Amino acid sequence: MSADFAPYWQQTLDDLARYPARPELELLPLRCTDFATLYSVRLSSLGPYRLFGYLSIPTGTGPFPAIYYAPKYQSVLEIIPQGTANLQRSAYVTFALAGRGQRNADTPYAAMFPGLFTEGIDHATSYIFRGIAADAVRGFEFLLARPEVDSARVVVVGNDMALITAALHPAATYVVTTPALFYNTVELAPKTQAYPLEELNDYLRAYPERLEAVRATLAYYDLRAFAPRLTATTLLIAGAAGPLLNRQALTPLVAALPGRVTVYDSEQSSYKDGLYIERWVAAQCGIPEVQRILPAHWQ
């Protein structure tokens, strides 16, 4: 962990606070159903930079539990994750956010994939993920301000950015995180040729003289540094026995988390993993009859 980890992130949050969110919502009738209403959302983040998201609100009387889909490492934003049943929107307020560079939030910066992970990585103050982390916090603030949301039942879901968001904003009650980018990155990347970590290998082959600068930047983002700040009940998705980020590799991260933690070993099946996550989230949020919101092919 960097010696000035806390000041770095406090400065990021202070800088973010200087920019009002100024949200604009637009009804999307084509994506509305009899059980949920969908809006596109535009709001401002650090920069200022204009972001995009999808907000879905269940029909009926709230407040409802909420799921926040933090920005992913992919170009396209989904309303809910591919493969998830649309009926999830009948039980939860859902908000999915595109961070800067993702499609619909790609003006003036359109990210490349691969490419986003290493954008500005040799300078901590200009690293693109400083802005993306601020974006994730801003989206979470927007969701929490919605009157339809039960603030005691808010789940942040995603990769590393889910854990980072919940560590930077204490209001998350539950977290589902699948580490992929920011765990012991410089040491683990040379052991794989799989993306996204191979992107770092590509970068350091091109710029080997920047290794120590990259290491210094990534010290601000390592999940082990964020872990002590996390108060939410956490579901951590570990890789299967073979991959780098398996249960054994993630043991130091689990040990650093102060709250209740469940570690789930991925079965490398979107069905099996998705079913476990849906049931875990429903149990935490007190959603009865979870079967009714599962995809038909999962039942």
Residue ranges and their predicted role:
Residues 1-36, 289-299:
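N-terminal targeting or regulatory segments adjacent to alpha/beta-hydrolase or S9 domains
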Residues 19-61:
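N-terminal cap/lid segment of alpha/beta-hydrolase-fold proteins
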Residues 60-65, 69-106, 185:
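Short substrate-entry loop that stabilizes the transition state in hydrolases
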Residues 84-134:
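Cap/lid segment of the alpha/beta-hydrolase catalytic domain
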Residues 117-157:
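Gly/Ser-rich "nucleophile elbow"/oxyanion-hole loop immediately N-terminal to the catalytic nucleophile
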Residues 162-208:
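Hydrolase active-site cap/lid region
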Residues 229-230, 236-238:
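Short beta-strand/loop motif that positions the catalytic acidic residue
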Residues 251-299:
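C-terminal catalytic histidine-bearing segment of alpha/beta-hydrolase fold enzymes
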